[in-house]
Regions:
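H-loop/switch region of ABC-family ATPase nucleotide-binding domains
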Residues: 143-144
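Hydrophobic anchor residue at the start of the ABC signature
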Residues: 97
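Conserved ABC ATPase signature
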Residues: 83-87, 91
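Conserved beta-strand-loop-alpha-helix hinge in the C-terminal portion
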Residues: 163-188
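Catalytic Walker B motif of ABC-type/P-loop ATPase nucleotide-binding domains
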Residues: 108-111
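Conserved ABC ATPase "signature" region
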Residues: 60-79
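Conserved ABC transporter NBD signature motif
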Residues: 10-24
Length: 194
């Protein structure tokens, strides 16, 4: 979806506009399951500043204030001077999510965003992700976490071995029952992703 895999083919279309792989790299942001591959700077604050759009992504007072607000939302402000690699797995995950928020990209893909998160922070991240979607951003979440799905998703696509199995809305009881049945079935095995 983000245009990172050259061997994958397909079209991303948003609001009637089709995007090439190169264009997708500019409009998409991806939070990887293993965030250790996407943390590059010497501090948590610098990591968030790095993701901000434009060439003015420096430590101007305005950018720092915005970054600190995002870090506060992710419960990370006390760690702003810490090296990202010195944080716990869940804290690193939240730094990557904070960077995604700071990027202001219109399409954000989250791959297993709750890995390493405790219940409190999972709910906090779900609220932030829902806020991004409510602000008009397109959010795609790859996860096996039913509580996270129910807290911030409105549409589910089930993939099995790379093929579309089913898709549905979650706003009604039928959709929630389908999700519940999916996870009950998943417990029995299979290579399924939501």
């Amino acid at each position: 979806l983000c245009g990172l895999e050259k061997r994958c083919k397909g079209i991303l279309e948003k609001e009637g506009t089709s995007y090439s792989s190169k264009q997708r790299l500019k409009i998409c942001y991806m939070v990887m399951q293993d965030v250790n591959h996407q943390l590059f700077t010497e501090s948590v604050l610098e990591e968030v500043l790095l993701s901000m759009p434009g060439k003015d992504s420096d430590e101007s007072p305005e950018n720092v204030a915005k970054a600190e607000a995002i870090l506060t939302e992710m419960d990370l402000l006390p760690y702003k001077a810490c090296h990202p690699m010195g944080l716990s797995g869940g804290q690193k995950q939240r730094v990557a999510i904070a960077s995604a928020i700071a990027s202001e990209r219109p399409v954000i893909l989250f791959d297993e965003p709750t890995s390493g998160l405790d219940l409190f922070h999972m709910r906090q991240v779900a609220d932030s992700v829902k806020g991004l979607a409510d602000s008009g951003k397109t959010i795609v979440i790859v996860t096996h976490d039913p509580e996270f799905i129910l807290r911030c998703c409105n549409y589910v696509i089930h993939l099995e071995n790379g093929r579309l199995e089913e898709n549905y809305f979650l706003q009604d009881t039928e959709g929630r029952e389908r999700l519940f049945n999916f996870f009950m079935m998943e417990g029995g095995g299979g290579n399924q992703t939501v």
